[in-house]
Amino acid sequence: MGRAEREAFLAEPRVAVLSVVSEGDRPPSTLPTWYAYEPGGTLTVVTRQGRRKSRLIRRAGVLSLSVQRPEVPYRYVTVEGTVVRQEPATEADLRRIGARYLPAADLDGWVAWEAGGQNANGTPEVVEVRPDRWLTGDFS
């Protein structure tokens, strides 16, 4: 895929798989995640402050994120990038990501739930990543 095509593919609302180096002799931590991306910009994910994924990302300072189209013809885009921001998520951060995945009627309630600290998994944290390397596949 060329630059414009891979960036457009990544900008579509897909569930991504995020990988970050783990501790000790454990394999990389690999988890599904929501994300936001606009062509030419940075990649943004939300995690939880103090949780394992957040700690690993902070320690490593880099991560990989992969999205795919599971139907024939298969396609995928993987981004390897450097963390440029990791801090408490604002309502604007939550809204930007949530709007990609939730029906409009549910977005305000979800943002209020997350921003209000009602998620038992912890306080939302935004991680912003600068894409450094792109890997793509197109089996059409």
Which residues does each predicted region cover?
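Short acidic (Asp/Glu) patches
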Residues: 50, 61-64, 107-114
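Alpha-helix boundary recognition
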Residues: 10-11, 58-59, 98
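Short secondary-structure boundary/capping segments
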Residues: 7-8, 35, 55, 117-119
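A short beta-turn/loop motif at secondary-structure boundaries
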Residues: 24-27, 70-73, 117-121
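Extreme N-terminal tail/first-helix region
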Residues: 1-15, 73
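Short, surface-exposed beta-strand-loop junctions and turns on beta-sheet-rich folds
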Residues: 51-53, 72
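Short beta-strand segments
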Residues: 13-49, 57, 63-67, 76-78
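Charged, gly/pro-rich active-site loop segments
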Residues: 75-140
